[in-house]
């Protein structure tokens, strides 16, 4: 009798083990949705990187090297590549969820790839010198190819991360006389680049937003291959590449605070670009350097924040697609309980 009871108990135990083994097997759908839903945690380091870049951009000084500016763009490109790879790797493991794959593919093509391509164009455009200048150092035009590369790359990124109503390329608030005098920061005379002229440049930079500067760069035409005279400069690129000459800005399209700030930022970042400062006057050199550093810092910090916000928005869109897939799956199971039961075993 005991043997029969033992046999029955053993049989029941085996049945229970068999049932439970089917019950604990993880549903591939659930595994995929959970892994993607938790993917946001995997991007924490990405947003830490963005935070570091923003903090660094706010800390740009006159002695910051142009090559350090190039590193920001290199970091942007690498960050976009990292996000792209993580998303594509996860989708490749679970290719059955077409809706999610479509959203991811669109985000990669329309956002990540374009930002990466724009950032890549900046890598060789910056040079090794400091963005500011030394006491009694001569002004020098920025290399045309370098300026045009910066304009093209920033334009590509701005087209992705800023809406048309974000920033005004023609924004202007300061007096006409002040704006004209900024041309003297590019001059070669011993008295060019005074503290007063630097203050006029700083006023232009302070009067507008970083988005205004970015739009002025994005909407700037190219700097021509020939010698560019400051009094003939029409846009930010031409201000950046204008030859060292003691002239005022004269063309109306260039006498806009946003365009002036953009031209200063481009000249400071691009190869060979230097500003004038009154000879043997340290306060003027400091004022000019402060204006250059301010223009670059405002431009880069705004750009990086806009990229971060765009990436964050894209990841949220992917999460919204996941929520739709989950709801659809539940609805399908509710209308076909037999199939749902089979898939759970």
Swiss-Prot record:
Alphabetized, the UniProt keywords read: Cell outer membrane, Lipoprotein, Membrane, Palmitate, Plasmid, Signal
What family name appears in the similarity comment?
Belongs to the variable large protein (Vlp) family. Delta subfamily.
In this record, residues modified by a lipid of the kind N-palmitoyl cysteine are 19
Instruction: Tell me which species this is from.
Output: Borrelia hermsii
Which residues are the lipid attachment points (S-diacylglycerol cysteine)? 19
Q: By its UniProt entry, which InterPro entries does this protein fall under? A: Borrelia_lipo
Any one cellular component term from GO for this entry? Answer: cell outer membrane
Is Calcium one of the keywords?
Answer: no
What does the UniProt entry say about where the protein is found? Cell outer membrane
Q: Which residues form the signal peptide?
A: 1-18
UniProt keyword Ion transport, yes or no: no
Gene that produces this protein: vlp23
> Which Pfam family is an annotated match for this chain, by its short name?
Lipoprotein_2
Q: What is this protein called?
A: Variable large protein 23
């Amino acid at each position: 009798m005991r043997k029969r009871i033992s046999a029955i108990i053993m049989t029941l135990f085996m049945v229970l083990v068999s049932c439970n083994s089917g019950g604990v097997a993880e549903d591939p759908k659930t595994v995929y949705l959970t892994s993607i839903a938790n993917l946001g945690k995997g991007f924490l380091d990405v947003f830490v990187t963005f935070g570091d870049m923003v903090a660094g951009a706010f800390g740009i000084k006159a002695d910051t090297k142009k090559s350090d500016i190039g590193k920001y763009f290199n970091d942007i490109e690498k960050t976009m590549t990292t996000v792209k790879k993580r998303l594509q790797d996860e989708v490749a493991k679970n290719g059955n969820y077409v809706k999610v794959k479509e959203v991811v593919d669109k985000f990669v093509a329309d956002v990540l790839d374009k930002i990466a391509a724009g950032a890549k164009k900046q890598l060789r455009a910056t040079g090794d010198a400091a963005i500011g200048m030394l006491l009694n150092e001569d002004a020098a035009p920025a290399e045309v190819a370098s300026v045009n590369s910066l304009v093209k790359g920033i334009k590509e990124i701005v087209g992705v991360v800023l809406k048309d109503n974000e920033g005004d390329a023609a924004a202007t608030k300061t007096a006409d006389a002040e704006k004209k005098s900024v041309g003297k920061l590019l001059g070669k005379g011993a008295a060019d680049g005074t503290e007063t002229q630097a203050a006029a440049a700083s006023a232009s930079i302070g009067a507008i937003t970083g988005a205004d500067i970015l739009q002025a760069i994005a909407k700037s035409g190219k700097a021509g291959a020939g010698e560019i005279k400051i009094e003939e400069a029409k846009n930010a690129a031409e201000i950046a590449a204008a030859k060292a000459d003691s002239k005022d800005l004269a063309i109306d399209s260039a006498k806009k605070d946003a365009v002036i700030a953009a031209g200063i930022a481009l000249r400071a970042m691009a190869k060979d670009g230097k500003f004038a400062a009154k000879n043997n006057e340290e306060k003027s050199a400091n004022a000019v350097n402060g204006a250059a550093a301010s223009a670059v810092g405002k431009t880069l910090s705004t750009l990086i924040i806009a990229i971060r916000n765009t990436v964050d928005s894209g990841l949220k869109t992917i999460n919204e697609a996941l929520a739709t897939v989950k709801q659809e799956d539940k609805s399908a199971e509710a209308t076909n309980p037999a199939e749902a039961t089979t898939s759970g075993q």
